[in-house]
Amino acid sequence: LFNEERFRSIPIHYRLNRIPSYGFIFYQHRSAASTNNQFIPYPFYARPVAVRPHAQKPQWQDQPNVYPPTGARRPRPHASFIAIPPKKNQDTTAIPAINSIATVEPTLIPTTEPVVNTVVIPEAASEFLITNTPETTAVQVSSTVV
């Protein structure tokens, strides 16, 4: 408890300058030099100030932060002018925007005709085999040519 009280009374800048992990990061140690010496480089440049004995400050009028309007203001219409008036005829049916009288053309689906393949079997030369591709059925037809 005695060490904490004694450590708390030490100023913070003295404490940070004495601890190397903090002091060299936060405080740049440089030698004291006057700012008006032209031979010593100094990181901060002072602004030259011209002093006149009888110079008057310009007296500016305090103006608001918004710009004044450039022309005459146009009147705003009242809110009732913008509102949509109610419909007068509630009994009549509304005309739809879409033309429902137009005929709807059905979409044509392309039909595939069955392809007939004629295959000659060497064992039975007198018979032809006809097959339909979609149904894959075989039909034997006897020919008159021998």
Swiss-Prot record:
Tissue: Mammary gland specific. Secreted in milk.
Chain positions found as Phosphoserine: S143
Disulfide bond positions: none
Transport is among the record's keywords: no
InterPro entries listed in its UniProt record: Casein_kappa
Keywords, sorted A to Z: Glycoprotein, Milk protein, Phosphoprotein, Secreted
Localization, UniProt: Secreted
Origin superkingdom: Eukaryota
Residues bearing glycans: T107, T112, T118
Site (Cleavage): S80, F81
One protein family per Pfam: Casein_kappa
A GO CC term attached to the entry: extracellular space
Reported function: Kappa-casein stabilizes micelle formation, preventing casein precipitation in milk.
Record protein name field: Kappa-casein
